[in-house]
């Protein structure tokens, strides 16, 4: 599409801010769409895009107290109260009216819904979006990162009517995009809906530049000895990330090393973080829960200390751990390759199905950490030539399969279909 025919596109989600996978991947879509001449606007409960392009509604956030109260009655239970049903519909009405105002304010011609019709983190928002699309026939794209049936905490629920209607809805003006082939197959099996596969990407045609010096003091700021290895766990602290295996790896390496975790405890509670803290003490491993020192962009804490970017973290790391059991795609995998680091990772299903056949060289772990994994990790840490060989091989594969060029061509096709062109 030429810039003369650019469209006004509205992104909708519970949160479009920070370092979570949905927000980061949405930002890549925005970058490509903007380069294609389109104007992007944002509706969410939390948003860190320019003020003149956002419409922020607190009730759209999954952490809003009213939404949290609803979640507690809708999930991990078999029945819900009539009060909950009434509150869902009351909030649905409020959110739908705000969505209408968002569309009118910015003249939105296409909506891209980022996971808000995929996983029921905010049921009233999903129902509101569904009704709005049914009432307006506005072209829309559902960008699905993960579905409710993929998460154990949504298996038991009292929300069947909402899930069938809105997570995701099946509407003639809504096109579905999935990030892995298994999700597309399961979506078709459950709903009969077709989907388009657009995997996550990074800008592999423009590799990261040489560090500019800002992060030269990263180790000293975190009280890590210059001779210690920095092992990086660049994920949220949730059980499916299996961070205890990263702790075990550091213990068994028999090398001076510190494990740095860059993200906060996720939306599944703090008990897992407490478990990891206790486990690290038992294993005598230094683990830094350093979320307050890392963000998507560089900044300063309220007391003036440096906040480093995720890019800084990757570039100063010696090895990345990613022992997840389940991922929708695996942003940390792509980021590790982009910043030219070796990776120890879990062989989660999507990696085995969609990614591994392309020939990547990783240290793959199964249900337990085996001695072979320890030997391989120690080798890449102590043999620079081996490390360089692996990271260059992986980078070239990502340039071929997961670059911005791939995303650009697919988005052009998707938008042409959405507008009937």
Identify what each model region corresponds to.
Residues 325:
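Aromatic "clamp/platform" in nucleotide-sugar-dependent glycosyltransferases that forms part
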Residues 4-6, 32-35, 41-110, 294-295:
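A conserved catalytic-core segment of Leloir-type glycosyltransferases
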Residues 149, 162-217:
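Donor nucleotide-sugar binding/catalytic pocket of nucleotide-sugar-dependent glycosyltransferases
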Residues 11, 219-220, 224-241, 247-250, ...:
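Conserved donor-binding/catalytic core segment of Leloir-type glycosyltransferases
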Residues 382-416:
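A charged, aromatic-enriched C-terminal amphipathic alpha-helix characteristic of glycosyltransferases
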Residues 270-312, 359-361:
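Nucleotide-activated donor-binding/catalytic signature segment of Leloir-type glycosyltransferases, i.e.
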